Amino acid sequence: MSGKGEGPAIGIDLGTTYSCVGVWQHDRVEIIANDQGNRTTPSYVAFTDSERLIGDAAKNQVAMNPVNTVFDAKRLIGRRFSDSSVQSDMKLWPFKIQAGPADKPMIYVEYKGEEKEFAAEEISSMVLIKMREIAEAYLGVTIKNAVVTVPAYFNDSQRQATKDAGVIAGLNVMRIINEPTAAAIAYGLDKKATSVGEKNVLIFDLGGGTFDVSLLTIEEGIFEVKATAGDTHLGGEDFDNRMVNHFVQEFKRKSKKDITGNPRALRRLRTSCERAKRTLSSTAQTTIEIDSLYEGIDFYSTITRARFEELNMDLFRKCMEPVEKCLRDAKMDKSTVHDVVLVGGSTRIPKVQQLLQDFFNGKELCKSINPDEAVAYGAAVQGAILSGEGNEKVQDLLLLDVTPLSLGLETAGGVMTTLIPRNTTIPTKKEQVFSTYSDNQPGVLIQVYEGERARTKDNNLLGKFELSGIPPAPRGVPQITVCFDIDANGILNVSAEDKTTGQKNKITITNDKGRLSKDEIEKMVQEAEKYKSEDEEHKKKVEAKNALENYAYNMRNTIQDEKIGEKLPAADKKKIEDSIEQAIQWLEGNQLAEADEFEDKMKELESICNPIIAKMYQGAGGEAGGPGASGMDDDAPPASGGAGPKIEEVD
């Protein structure tokens, strides 16, 4: 334990399509399965007229309720509504998105009959809460501390927004780390004993929605990210889409019907395609069978692995480009890469493995760690290190992350002057002296940008501030020191100081555009609590309803049992039967009643049935004898307590 009484620190891989959680325990990492027994949980949140669902339950009902089922929140987090990637993604999502204040994309759903709006951070926080609960259920303690991973590509505002999601979920996010770095840690632990000297490792991470390639060097437990590249919009879902389109065309040819306007049909087809894709990684062909796909028409078809590869060949080939770019950026030849590590479920596709292996001239790929779990595995190790729980096995792992994009400021003529080049190891600090470019200039505007282009207009403005009060002087005379300082979480502080007057000003770039304010986070934390208590209420309701239902049906079965039925006076038997009938009728009409209504109904029913049954047992005491009587009790429904174990299964 971390000695803070907060249970161990967990590692969470918050994925675009699936998330995964791990913890360091008994000197190794445990990847924790959810209540469905799955070691990964869909990053889905659904809202219905009666409840909120997260994870498998949400994904399973997406066909019935596409407009109120939110997924892909990671594609929105820390972005602006007007961002071109948000605009193009919106076309593919069934749920509604509109621009909120400050150009922030807001998600609209209907929940319990009213329209609700959520920021991407809130949706992600719900997934994080789910992951935390999965860990808590397994460990039996409350958990506060977590390490959360993000793509190496994420810029500052996306990292910050992910951190905010953690805060809303009631977590203390100890560190945000890059996914490839996490995978490398998982891998480093596996390989550490044997390695001597520096190793270059290429992490090839092809997940459900994104693709990242990173090149790291590992030496004596020190990890350094040398370069990153990738495509934020390439992944398993794209392969599914190709297959979906293929079958939509086939359905058009066979039945002259176009299903593209029907979200439910498309969703059912997509679910089948996803399953088929997974099957094709281990078999040469598979079938798709969907009853009554559209207007009552059944759809049966087969697809071979070769056809699947042909549909996606251009995408598979595209996966190799970032690998080349990554090597170029790191100024490294592919022959100097010691290991190629596969991460992400889509790396199970044989063709992807083959292309990658060919690129590295037949080199064996590392598949020793389950590709779905490697990132959470590494995050859990990092959590153990940060909370001082790990043993000597992990303590000497040091983690050096890098900045994914160059950071700098605008100088005369809109030129980007870089202070911190991309792929610089962080934490880092750089200073440079600037001056004024006109005589008697009273102040300078410091504009901070991230990006690789030569002109600032092509890069991303992170923030700006004014340093004023510069005493009149000819141009080029004042000495203004600008300092860029990035901490271990990749959060940037920029300060400027006029050397002559000591005038100072600074800015923390936690990307205020689209960044949540303290108040908003506070409000969202309260909302999260509210939703949690509503979920609890709903669970209580379901349990009370099930208890009543179990009691009524058990009682009905009991009095229908001949051994018991014949011992009951007819009037009593009728009285019980009527009260049960009435209760079952009431149940059917009041599925959405409150928990206490169900409990009252239960008490009412018990007050009628229990005395009669008890009287019967006392009366039967003579013939039945001691043991007999207790034997009867097993049939007779005990009060709500007896429904206990059954309830859990229903829920």
Curated annotation (Swiss-Prot):
Other facts: Plants overexpressing HSP70-1 show disabled immune responses, enhanced tolerance to heat shock and altered plant growth and development. Plants overexpressing HSP70-1 are hypersensitive to abscisic acid (ABA) in seed germination assays, and are compromised in the dark- and ABA-induced stomatal closure.
Name assigned to this protein: Heat shock 70 kDa protein 1
Molecular function in Gene Ontology: ATP binding; ATP-dependent protein folding chaperone; mRNA binding; protease binding
Region (Disordered): 618-651
Cellular compartments annotated: Cytoplasm, Cytosol; Nucleus
Function: In cooperation with other chaperones, Hsp70s are key components that facilitate folding of de novo synthesized proteins, assist translocation of precursor proteins into organelles, and are responsible for degradation of damaged protein under stress conditions. Probably involved in defense response. Chaperone involved in protein targeting to chloroplasts. May cooperate with SGT1 and HSP90 in R gene-mediated resistance towards the oomycete Hyaloperonospora parasitica (downy mildew). Plays a role with WPP-domain proteins in facilitating WIT1 nuclear envelope targeting.
Residues modified as N-acetylserine: 2
Keyword Plastid on entry: no
Record field: compositional bias (Gly residues): 619-629
Inducing or repressing factors: Induced by heat shock and cold. Induced by dehydration stress and abscisic acid (ABA). Up-regulated by viral infection.
